Amino acid sequence: MNSPAYIPDTPEIAQHRRAIKANPRDARNHALLGIDLLRVHRLDEGVAALKKALALDASLGALYGVLAPALHDLGQRKEAIDAYRRAIKLQANDADLHKGLADVLRQDGQLDAAIASAGRAAALAPAHAAIQLGLAVAMHAAGRYSEAAAAFRQVLALAPEHLDARMDLGRTLMRLDDHLGAAVCFEQVLERCPKQIDAHITLGTCLRKLDRRSEAAELYGRALILQPDDATLLAELGFCQQEMGQLDAARATLERSAALAMPDENVLRALGLCQFELGDWTQARANWERAMEMAPSANSHSALLFLLSHSLSDAAALTAAHRDFGARWETPLLAQRMPHPNLRDPQRVLRIGFVSPDLHSHAVAQFISPVFALLKESKMLKQYVYYNNSIDDETTRLLRGYVPDWREIHGLDDVAVEELIRADAIDILIDLAGHSALNRLTLFARKPAPVQASWIGYAGSTGLQAMDYYLADQFYLPQGRYDDQFCEKIVRMPLIAPFLPHAAAPEVSPLPALANGHITFGSFHRANKVSRDAVALWSKLLRAVPDAKMLIGGTYNNNEAAMLRWFEEQGIGRERLILRERTTMGKYLAQHADVDICFSPFPYTGATTVCHALWMGVPTLTTIGPTNPSHAALGYLAHLGLSSFLADDDASFVNLGVFLSQNLPTLAALRAGMRERFTSSVVGYPGVVAAGLELALRKMWMQWCDGKTPEAIRVHLAELSGGQDMPAT
């Protein structure tokens, strides 16, 4: 806000100055001068004159009621509070003084005291809307949203046309997750004031929360007619378009917002995410790094590392980037670590905690579900879950049934969760997210449990020294190949994780090439996993097999646009590409009936999509590189005896693809027998993972009980106890 223009002395001020010159000890003249100076917004001079008057004559205590708001306007909150309290001693029933004190206390962060003062003001003036508003605002500032909503409604009962109170009620209802009620408030504001931009923005947010995004987009569009260059409106429209999957439009809108005003970190993150999803990894990285510089946070840092794991083939650079995460976010917490009183008994029942945001309809849940079910029966382990998400679906309820000691930690800070974990006396705490979204790695950095490990959720190191182990198997992380890329010591079990086929999976179809007369390659991976280099390699094979087609699954709202441009650059016409939109799990799995061989992208190959394809009879042709994320696909292929589908370099990838396309009977036989191959391997035996994990945990625990530092661990299949859910050794 601009300061008011300087107003020269009025005749009254000049008269007071002459009187003071004639009699400098007359407190009344100083008081009158101060009051008239405040009237012309000359606050510093007015405050000085009032203080002089009070110094000359302490009986002029009523002046504190004039002095207090002026001190408040000057930002001198401590002095303003003192002045208000002195004034209230003399005028205890003055509601305006109590409200003024409440406002200063609220801005000074003294929220309980502010509510008390605002409450006294409200009691003194129950029919005064502005006084009642002070109480509502104080309640809102203190996070007492239900009481604040009631107070704002009281204001509106007194003054129905009070638009600020109606806006504030809407914002309070949003805090209470009553987005429908909030939307009504903002709509009422717009009925009375159609050009109120803030009401457009907040109503749009409510509509998005209510899954009415197309209405929100239309609302933002109407507001932009009023304010076409409003960067905030454009940003909100961009967020909305992004949520609707309109990635090209969202990117353009967010870029326009960023060009009009210095973008905040939220705009940069959203723009970076659009660019990431559209395959523009270079620009995505640049924007996420800018967002990190503007508002450093562990979550933003994790998002950047997630992108780098998809795009970097430089092992040293990727390793250094992950270790920088630990240096930045773990080091400041070292002094806060507390000792662990856990009983060092190597043979006792162990309390195992799992921390994850993905225990819902997510790939992690698909892998972990059979393990939870089997470990529930263990007599030597007790499972605990710390779930960091508000999603509660059928999968969540299934998993909760396996783990009665289930804690909801979404919305709790790290200190509170650490207290919970220590109260549960957890012996080994397992991270199931790594650097994926909604992770709690800063919780692990506090070392709430004596032994900590990362598993399944992320193809790479956490970068934390507090994370003792990373759980894998000998195919996923071959001995010595990637160990130096991890802060953690590698635990190699017989199988990293089981794969539970989806109930909606149809039967395996015959090889489609036999009926089509040509081979069809396919990729069902997320578009943001597919790099330009991967498309270039796939295109070499498509050029070498000129009648082949390629099916690209999982597309939505043009997120495959960049990929199509890359194919075109490589001379692969649109007529050779078959696009299939993202759909239900059953329909997605059925689409494999149209594919003979799948490709894995690189440098981030993935595992879940490979397992889905294998269950549907489709092998995946893959490569490996110098980083751990490039190895995930081979892990499951190797367990099924399909290491021959690994190509060592580009030339062998093309040669192998050509060979397979010319040997359809071999592919057909492999397809027909794939499920038997799947179910007879360790991948088809969840008991291998459950027993392997239990033994690995025991070895990790014994290491801690002996006071030894973590070291690499190997669990062999032959070490596991036999049972119905175990393959023959």
Residue spans of the language-model regions?
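Short alpha-helix at the nucleotide-sugar/activated-sugar donor binding site of glycosyltransferases
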Residues: 613-615, 638
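Glycosyltransferase donor-sugar binding loop
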Residues: 386-391, 549-562
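Alpha-helical solenoid repeat scaffolds of the TPR/TPR-like class and their adjacent stem/linker regions
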Residues: 1-518, 536, 565-572, 584-597, ...
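Short hydrophobic "strand-cap" motifs at the C-terminus of beta-strands
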Residues: 355, 524-525, 553, 580
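Short glycine/serine-rich donor-binding loops of glycosyltransferases
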Residues: 609-610, 633
